[in-house]
Design a protein with these regions (language model features):
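Short loop/turn segments that connect beta-strands within beta-propeller blades
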Residues: 70-74, 114-118, 158-162, 200-203, ...
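Active-site microenvironment of metallo-dependent hydrolases
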Residues: 3, 287, 292, 306, ...
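N-terminal export signals
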Residues: 2, 8-29
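Active-site neighborhoods of metal-dependent hydrolases
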Residues: 729-747, 793-914, 987, 1000-1023
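Divalent metal-dependent hydrolysis catalytic cores, especially in the metallo-beta-lactamase
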Residues: 661-681, 698-705, 735-747, 756, ...
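Short coil/turn segments that connect the beta-strands within blades of beta-propeller domains
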Residues: 54-56, 94-96, 138-140, 182-184, ...
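A flexible loop/linker signature enriched in serine peptidases of the S9 family
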Residues: 42, 57-67, 82-86, 99-111, ...
Length: 1023
């Protein structure tokens, strides 16, 4: 067990000031706290607490640190620093020691520390998580929960020896253990819907509490007399229950943690942002505390911003899904919204398919004479085959839904592909027969065939437990004859880099699978069924993406926007010359647009009839309407700045939405999007296609894959397990022109510090899912009011959606942005279905997406919507307090996890319904995100020098927020679109015969052995 010094504990936390303690609180020097000083925080969101055995002190967690405060209240003393990331303290029986969970090294482990914060010692190690520790009454044992057994179970640790014993071992998720007063029993939650009690002597378990339907249970705790207390949450209600009696007040926001008992008739628990003493006869007293939390203003660094006026020719780096021909002489890929064919040795590629639709994922037939690919030219993504010599096209599928990511079998008789639900199908080209190869998978990778055509392999996620969704991206093999599924880690506790184009890919001779792990290429020897026959071997040590075999013994890959090849022995790496360039498209003309009214994005009221004078795609002047005829007569409309959705993921379902997506955003007046995470080469390709004018859609700022920790969930998150790998991720970001960097849920604080420093040196802002210590280490923003968190709950909103002083004050004081992504805004469809029924929505939504949207709107008519609206009101209240306090709120939706385009308007309407003025709401979707992007004055406003990104609407959006969606015309960079023009490609479709037009229904039988198999759309937040 490694002991860490107190200086280690507090280093970097802004709480070590020459070891000086002032008024019982850890002091913070001006140099350490920065110019912002310290905020005196007296409320905490989702804090947990534990009373010392003598009843004199309370230990609690706040801003992911452990603090103590006298039971009478007063100044809180901080015991741990930022990098320890410690929560959920529990006292030893002698009152000298605390145990807590801490995320110091990328997994949750148990630590002890003395009551003064010294003597920090790590008790558990390894790749599994260890959480929720509680000392036994005799102090000899610590009970905790862990996923070390394949699901969450209750374990005990012998304090003297460190030996760990599993106490429960079932498929259920067992957590939050609590000791009986005599130390002979443990109570714990089961799947959050029940509480069981284990007799440690006999091993017998008994069910003591079962939650009502729709309720969850948290934090069991035994009273001195053995009565069980716990927290019950149902809908918009959270209650503290003792025995069979609710002891909390109506409307109280009880946090989901175990109470501590002061006596048989009094306990301490956390609720409403406070530490509360509560007697069972109903008396409540707040234990007031003041915690000095360091606050720093956002770092002042030189921002890298896009030159929105540039017409300079640029090298294409957005080379999406490259694949080599069987003879190794050609490469097919997508770039600039077209499919291309490169003959190796001739750097100038030939453009194959460029009809304006979304054409993607080419693959060669075995003879190399044709490619198959996916295209939405007939409405949805279908499979097509193109003869490379003649250009003749053949439609292979005309099925409902999307058919994407095709891969031909080695003999050319079959195609494996993925549908919109994550099911892999096999199409027999001779008969047209379709066979379902896999159940529904969560965002799987592109399949690859064994040489004998009997097995498929692909990347798929396997979580560590049901309780927390993260896991590793593994090699999934599918025996096509038996349907047997087999998961194999590429290396112990490692992930395939992304579940897209990073493998696995089978070598032509069947000897190897190749894949990318930690941004480098590896090969592993396999048998005919894809079973590993030896350890994986590293092939490259530079940034490596998008693997394809180039003949039998070489690999094709992308290195920071350059095609390269290398031998499987790691030798002979060299560039494959490719000459492909583009110029940003710019409007070159002068226009005068006359409007009936104008909101300039700044003033709180409309201007009257105005002329917007445009020159070369920018606003030259805004003048009172003149007498000369305008170029564009929009006198029946109101002009406003184009809206900005600051949290989207273009390519989370990009293959399914295809060309519809950009058109939909424009049709709803959204002229700029920001993505905090997308598959990097899909992002780069779409960004360049939009800039070049080869694709229709809004501006696209963003980043590649988010930098994650040791575990992942989404297919576009990168596991990062070493500093060396972190440097590779940052090198990719610099080379491929990211606009920002997002760090994701499992990245530890020490790594996050490194990313912040490197990103700011490169001029890039950052965002994450965390407020603290992100605020203190220089992060620029936070996504969501409180979504997926490695804790399993948020420290910015409670389970009832409420935020307290810690969250609001730190946002206001620090200047960090918050992007709310109000998923509960679907509640507004209880009295307003105009967005659902709008022609733009009905035309541009894929049919299956529209059906889900209608179902969501229908749910707003049910009694359950009362809970949705209560949570929504709480979320908006938080955001409004931040906004009116001077904080930095930028609108974003998490589309397509929430519905593209329409969800931004639903968010705006929800803000207004629960307290924002229309002006305030619109500011969060125009001027504010423009400032975050570094384009204040260029985007989000109508003023001289701004880009001509304009939306022309019917009505007054400052009086009726619904008018912001009543778009008739939209302009991006001076290029004018009518709504009819945007809808036209998907309003009607030519009838094109297809090889197969009917498919058997997919079987979604849920196999408990693979409980995590589910469609991506079943999860509605990026969290």
């Amino acid at each position: 067990m490694h002991e860490v010094t107190r200086r280690d504990v507090l280093r970097g936390a802004g709480v070590l000031a020459g070891a000086t303690v002032v008024h019982g609180a850890a002091a913070t020097s001006a140099a350490e706290a920065g110019p912002g000083g310290a905020a005196g925080i007296g409320q905490g969101t989702n804090i947990s607490a534990s009373v010392s055995p003598d009843g004199k002190h309370v230990a609690f967690d706040l801003v992911t640190a452990i603090w103590t405060v006298p039971i009478a209240g007063g100044d809180a003393v901080r015991l741990t620093g930022d990098d320890i990331d410690a929560t959920q303290p529990s006292w030893s029986p002698d009152g000298r020691t605390l145990v807590c969970q801490a995320y110091r090294d990328g997994n949750y482990h148990l630590y002890t520390l003395r009551h003064d914060g010294s003597g920090l010692r790590q008790l558990t190690h390894g790749p599994f998580d260890h959480r929720e520790p509680r000392f036994s009454p005799d102090g000899k044992t610590i009970a905790f929960s862990s996923d070390r057994g394949g699901s969450y179970g209750v374990h005990t640790l012998d304090v003297a020896t460190g030996a760990i014993t599993a106490r429960t071992d079932t498929a259920a998720e067992e957590a939050m253990p609590a000791w009986s007063p005599d130390g002979r029993r443990l109570a714990y939650t089961v799947d959050s819907t029940a509480i069981d009690v284990l007799d440690l002597g006999t091993g017998a378990t008994s069910r003591v509490v079962t939650a009502p339907a729709g309720a969850s249970l948290y934090g069991p705790s035994f009273a001195p007399d053995g009565t069980l207390a716990y927290v019950r949450v149902a809908g918009a209600t959270a209650e503290l229950v003792v025995g069979d009696r609710v002891v909390s007040a109506k409307g109280e926001d009880v946090f989901g943690f175990a109470p501590s008992w002061l006596s048989a008739g009094e306990l301490l628990h956390t609720a409403d942002g406070h530490l509360k003493r509560r007697t069972l006869d109903g008396t409540t007293t707040v234990v007031a505390f003041t915690a000095a939390v360091p606050v720093v203003p956002r770092p002042d660094y030189h921002r890298k911003v896009r030159d929105l006026d540039s017409t300079r020719e640029q090298r294409v780096v957005g080379i999406a899904s490259p694949v080599a021909s069987p003879d190794g002489r050609q490469v097919a890929f997508r770039a600039l919204n077209a499919l291309w064919l490169l003959t190796i040795g001739d750097p100038v590629p030939r453009r194959l398919v460029a009809d304006g639709y979304f054409n993607s994922d080419p693959d060669f037939t075995p003879d190399g004479r044709s490619i198959v690919y996916a295209s939405d030219r007939t409405g949805d993504a279908d499979l097509w085959q193109r003869d490379l010599a003649t250009g003749d096209e053949r439609r292979l599928t005309g099925l409902p839904g999307a058919q994407t990511a095709p891969r031909l079998s080695p003999d050319g008789t079959k195609i494996a592909y993925c549908d919109q639900d994550g099911v892999v199908w096999v199409l027999d080209l001779a008969s047209g027969a379709l066979t379902q190869a896999t159940p529904t998978l969560f965002m799987p990778g592109r399949p690859t065939w064994s040489p004998d055509g009997r097995t498929l392999a692909l990347a798929a996620v396997k979580p560590y437990s049901r309780r927390f969704r993260e896991g590793t991206s593994q090699v999934l093999t599918v025996d096509l004859a038996t349907g047997t599924l087999t998961y194999t880690e590429p290396m112990p506790h490692a992930s395939i880099a992304t579940r897209g184009d990073d493998g696995p890919v089978w070598s032509p001779d069947g000897r190897y699978l190749a894949f990318t792990v930690e941004s480098c290429a590896w090969v592993v020897p396999v048998d005919a069924r894809g079973r590993f026959t030896g350890p994986a071997r590293q092939v490259t040590r530079e940034v490596t993406d998008s693997l394809s075999w180039l003949g039998r013994d070489r690999l094709l890959y992308l290195h920071n926007g350059t095609l390269r090849a290398v031998g499987v022995n790691g030798r002979g790496a060299k560039d494959i010359p490719l000459s492909l360039r583009y110029r940003p498209a710019r409007v070159r003309r002068h226009d005068v647009v006359r409007v009936g009214a104008l909101w300039d994005g700044s003033a709180p009221r409309l201007r009257g009839r105005s002329d917007i004078v445009l020159a070369d795609g920018k606003v030259e002047a805004v003048l009172p309407a003149g007498s000369r005829p305008p170029t564009v007569d929009a006198t029946h409309l109101t002009a406003m700045p184009g809206l900005i959705d600051a949290h989207v993921h273009w390519h989370l379902r990009g293959r399914h939405w295809g060309d519809r997506q950009g058109r939909l955003w424009l049709a709803y007046g959204i002229t700029t999007t920001r993505s905090p995470g997308d598959p990097v080469y899909q992002y780069a390709e779409t960004r360049e296609a939009l800039e070049s004018g080869d694709r229709v859609g809004p501006r696209y700022f963003g980043t590649g894959e988010a930098v994650d920790g040791s575990r992942v969930y989404y297919n576009f998150m990168r596991t990062t397990r070493s500093v060396a790998q972190l440097e590779l991720e940052l090198a990719r970001a610099r080379a491929l022109g990211y606009d920002m960097i997002k760090t994701y849920v499992r990245l530890p604080v020490a790594y996050q510090r490194r990313v912040v420093a490197a990103a700011h040196r490169a001029g890039l802002p950052l965002s994450s899912h965390y407020l603290y210590p992100a605020e203190h280490i220089g992060m620029d923003g936070m996504e969501h009011t409180g979504a997926t968190n490695r804790l399993g709950y948020s420290h910015t909103v409670s389970r009832l959606g409420r935020a307290y002083e810690d969250a609001v004050e730190l946002f206001v004081r620090s200047g960090m942005s918050i992007t709310p992504t109000l998923f509960n805004s679907a509640g507004i469809y209880d009295n307003d279905r105009t967005l659902v029924e709008d022609e733009r929505t009905r035309t541009l939504f894929p049919s299956w997406e529209y059906a889900q949207y209608v179902a969501k709107a229908d749910a707003a008519q049910t009694p359950a919507n009362a809970t949705t609206l209560a949570l929504l009101a709480a979320n908006v209240d938080m955001v409004l307090r931040i906004h009116r306090g001077g904080g930095f709120v930028i609108a974003g939706t998490d589309a397509p996890l929430d519905n593209p385009a329409v969800s931004l308007h639903a968010n705006l309407r929800a803000k207004v319904r629960f307290g924002f003025t229309p002006y305030e709401a619109l500011t969060t979707a125009t001027r504010n995100p423009a400032r975050w992007l570094g384009h204040a004055g260029e985007l989000g406003e109508i003023r001289p020098g701004a880009q001509a990104d304009l939306s022309f609407v019917t009505g007054d959006p400052l009086s009726d927020i619904r008018a912001a969606a009543a778009v008739q015309l939209v302009m991006k960079g001076g290029a004018l679109h009518t709504v009819d023009d945007l809808l036209a490609p998907f309003a009607t479709h030519a009838a094109v015969p297809a090889l197969v037009t009917t498919a058997p229904p997919a079987v979604h039988n849920h196999d408990e052995a693979f409980w995590w198999h589910e469609p991506e759309w079943a999860n509605h937040y990026c969290g």
